[in-house]
Amino acid sequence: MGFYQERIITQPYKMQNMTKKEFFKDAQFLVFANRLNEVALIFAGIYILFRWKSLPVHVPPLYLHSFTSFSNVLSSWCQYEALKYVSFPTQTVCKASKLVPTMIMGRIVRKRQYSIREYILAFIIVFGASIFFLSSTNQIKRESNDKRREEINSAISGFILMCGYLLLDAFTPNWQKKLFEQPPRLHTSQMMFAVNLFSVILCLISLLQQGTLLTSINFISKHENIFVDCLLLSLGSAFGQVFILMTVKRFGPVVLSLLMTIRQILSIFFSTYNFGHSITLIGFFGLFTVFGAIIVDIYSKYRINTGRRLR
């Protein structure tokens, strides 16, 4: 999915029957297309329709799901928009360090306490991510003054957008967890349906208010390959939700964390190969510091869970 995100945001598309190429600039339309993913929305709706008698009563007011949708939509917009200013590998390493904002939001939203080990892990991950980010900005020094100023402004813009993404993305699961904890417990399909529905409504209102819905559709209709890329991105997002839920249900969150970490590492190398990004030796050190800490944490959680089951 990351491949298509980067391709749509950073690569120009050729107009049909012409040699002219243009960039697709409306990140919000991509958020709308992803949240419109019929697979998640329709299947959740059908499941609720046919199984409503066996599902728990929906206790939380429906408007509470709009908070999840709002943070989810804004975090996705920040993620797509940031690709205009920072590379996909830089963005992925920053996303891997979202443990820190997740802990902050967990403390604020759910009053959760964290252990010393978790604080140390968070510090190591932030340290590695900072090294990786600074290694990419150090390459700016080799540019001319005007080019350097432009690159610095882009790096700052990308950093601000990634901070927005991390904070909003950290709020989303903590708020969902809070809703899930209210008895009787919500079913996953109820959560998926409500969040996707509110997200579609929020994006549609914003696109109509800005007048960019029709211009984005017009761009897609006049340029080659972008429709297929948007479709694959949307389907990847939808089936990704299903994959996450099935993995957690069958194998547990530890296996999911390991798979997601491996996916992130592979996506960085895949992006570097396909889009010509360069990573310095210092950048590789920061990269392996971040993902090494994450893998060690996953392994320690696995050992703890295994020990509890054997008792």
Indicate residue ranges for each PLM-predicted region.
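Polytopic endomembrane small-metabolite transporters, centered on the Drug/Metabolite Transporter
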Residues: 1-311
